[in-house]
Swiss-Prot record:
InterPro entries: Globin, Globin-like_sf, Globin/Proto, Hemoglobin_b, Hemoglobin_oxygen_transport. Heme b binds at residues 63, 92. Keywords: Heme, Iron, Metal-binding, Oxygen transport, Transport. The lineage of its organism: Eukaryota, Metazoa, Chordata, Craniata, Vertebrata. This is Hemoglobin subunit beta. The gene is HBB.
Length: 146
C-alpha cells in the first residue's frame, strides 16, 4: 500500500495524542458491547454480562491497551504492515480461530473512539487516512486466513 506524505502526517500526528490505555480499553469494550458475539473469544475474562461489567473489567482494559499498543506498531511501520502483523495473524487464525471480520469491526470502532476523543483534529481528511490504515491492518491480520 502506498501512503502520501499527508496521510502519514495525519496518522502520526493524531497517534501522538492518543492515550493507548484509555482509547484501547474503550475500543475493546465497545466491540464487546456493540457486537456481543465477539465475547466468545474472551470467555476467560470473567464477567462480561452487561455494559457496566465490560467497562469495569480490568482484563478488558488490559487487553484493550495491548491491542492498541500493537496497533501503534502499524503506525510506526506504515510501509511494512503486512510483515509487522504476520505473527499476530498466525496467532489469531491458527490458535484463536478469530473470525477475520472482527478485525474490520474493531477498526471501525477505533475510528469512532478517535473521532469522539479528537473531534477537532479528526477532519474528513484525517478520517480517510485512518480508515485506510484500519483497513490495511485488518487485511494484514486476516492474511493467514487466505
Amino acid at each position: 500500500v502506498q501512503w502520501t506524505a499527508e496521510e502519514k502526517q495525519l496518522i502520526t500526528g493524531l497517534w501522538g495524542k492518543v492515550n493507548v490505555a484509555d482509547c484501547g480499553a474503550e475500543a475493546l469494550a465497545r466491540l464487546l458491547i456493540v457486537y456481543p458475539w465477539t465475547q466468545r473469544f474472551f470467555a476467560s475474562f470473567g464477567n462480561l454480562s452487561s455494559p457496566t461489567a465490560i467497562l469495569g473489567n480490568p482484563m478488558v482494559r488490559a487487553h484493550g491497551k495491548k491491542v492498541l499498543t500493537s496497533f501503534g506498531d502499524a503506525v510506526k511501520n506504515l510501509d511494512n504492515i503486512k510483515n509487522t502483523f504476520a505473527q499476530l495473524s498466525e496467532l489469531h487464525c491458527d490458535k484463536l480461530h478469530v473470525d477475520p471480520e472482527n478485525f474490520r469491526l474493531l477498526g471501525d470502532i477505533l475510528i469512532i473512539v478517535l473521532a469522539a476523543h479528537f473531534a477537532k483534529d479528526f477532519t474528513p481528511e484525517c478520517q480517510a487516512a485512518w480508515q485506510k490504515l484500519v483497513r490495511v491492518v485488518a487485511h494484514a491480520l486476516a492474511r493467514k486466513y487466505h
